[in-house]
Amino acid sequence: MVQSLAWAGVMTLLMVQWGSAAKLVCYLTNWSQYRTEAVRFFPRDVDPNLCTHVIFAFAGMDNHQLSTVEHNDELLYQELNSLKTKNPKLKTLLAVGGWTFGTQKFTDMVATASNRQTFVKSALSFLRTQGFDGLDLDWEFPGGRGSPTVDKERFTALIQDLAKAFQEEAQSSGKERLLLTAAVPSDRGLVDAGYEVDKIAQSLDFINLMAYDFHSSLEKTTGHNSPLYKRQGESGAAAEQNVDAAVTLWLQKGTPASKLILGMPTYGRSFTLASSSDNGVGAPATGPGAPGPYTKDKGVLAYYEACSWKERHRIEDQKVPYAFQDNQWVSFDDVESFKAKAAYLKQKGLGGAMVWVLDLDDFKGSFCNQGPYPLIRTLRQELNLPSETPRSPEQIIPEPRPSSMPEQGPSPGLDNFCQGKADGVYPNPGDESTYYNCGGGRLFQQSCPPGLVFRASCKCCTWS
């Protein structure tokens, strides 16, 4: 009895230590600002006490140097990094790459040691200037999608160069070392072709495993976007299209469990059924599902678009749900499947959870009757992260005051403001704490982070 109590105490201590060290890594995108007003998302909409790390997606690359992508990226950087005044423990990273970025610029950059050093120096300068705490490499994928096989070794060299430079810069400057992470695939073929796992794991602070997109409307039958386990009867390659197989692969190839962060999606993959009466897993499909009312992309639905579908079922052996209505079918994750995945990653001793993406959860609590961020808040609770503690009065940062005009134009008296103007940001003569943003001929009014004002000279929010 004494031994069992002692063992229980040890296990409790381990759980407390694990929980306090767990990471909850959340991505946000710089294109969610263009969605319709009800679901438009800016960095200022991020709850600063929700995630331990927030990664801004995406930066680009020009002439082997980090670069912005959207015309107002630098303002969005400021919005994000100002959240650290509310939660000094929050870490922010900048992700470079992404699916649509492709591989060519990465391939050119890693081709020579000189090119890599150009990138390394630009990354150091860019991250420090913009106030980020680290860099996330999202090359999709070295050794794949037109990237030559030699990029596998060159990607390792890039990571080692960055890690060395980040360490040296921290020692010389006295600043906290910049973090270095990477987003990586689940597919065995892509992993084998592009990643020297044991080597890169030594230099990266953590690895974000993209454990989703296992099935999509590119296939002729329905399948789940992110199943935890294989389905009964699956074998061969089909049996590897799940979270457990992906985690096992990365662990077997040499990733320390504490560095592996399990990615989870706040979106679902949708299909159009060949027949509405044949609506199970593996049912024939004719193509992607219809665009969602807010995300407006074929084959993809946000959690806030899928959560209200009535005809919902669970794939018991895969621990995930799907739903259908008429000839539309969607596989997605919900609170229950996130709990199952959180329990799984704790059992495996992984370093935490990653979420793609903040803006596809029901971030306002407007659609699913579960409060704001139901999926991500579930992870925070299940990972035993500390509850948000009230700030003392001197720590409270006032929120930007509500705008008197709608965020989406045209607006009264300003219908023609963006006509003849290039996409970009412009001062608001009536209120220097806000600015006008012209994009595609539409007018938006946006607010600077608290305490900052907009200056036309730098087209940025700065101290008054």
Curated annotation (Swiss-Prot):
- Which gene name belongs to this protein? Chit1
**PANTHER family from the xrefs?**
CHITINASE, CHITOTRIOSIDASE-1
Subunit structure comment from the entry: Monomer.
Q: Where are the transmembrane segments?
A: none
What does the record list as GO biological process? chitin catabolic process; polysaccharide catabolic process
Its cellular-component GO annotations read: extracellular space; lysosome
Outcome recorded upon mutating residue 140 to Q: Loss of activity
Q: Recite the UniProt keywords alphabetically.
A: Carbohydrate metabolism, Chitin degradation, Chitin-binding, Disulfide bond, Glycosidase, Hydrolase, Lysosome, Polysaccharide degradation, Secreted, Signal
List the source organism: Mus musculus (Mouse)
Q: Which residues form the signal peptide?
A: 1-21
Q: Which enzyme type, at the first EC level?
A: hydrolase
* Domain Chitin-binding type-2, first and last residues per copy: 415-464
What protein name applies here?
Chitotriosidase-1
Family of this protein = Belongs to the glycosyl hydrolase 18 family. Chitinase class II subfamily.
Chief subcellular location: secreted
Residues noted as binding chitin in the record, renumbered to the chain:
70-71, 97-100, 210-213
> What tissues harbor this protein?
Highly expressed in tongue, stomach, kidney, brain, skin, testis, and bone marrow. Low level of expression was found in lung, heart, spleen, small intestine, and liver. Not detectable in pancreas, salivary gland, large intestine, uterus, or peripheral blood mononuclear cells (PBMC).
For the region Disordered, give the residue spans. 385-416
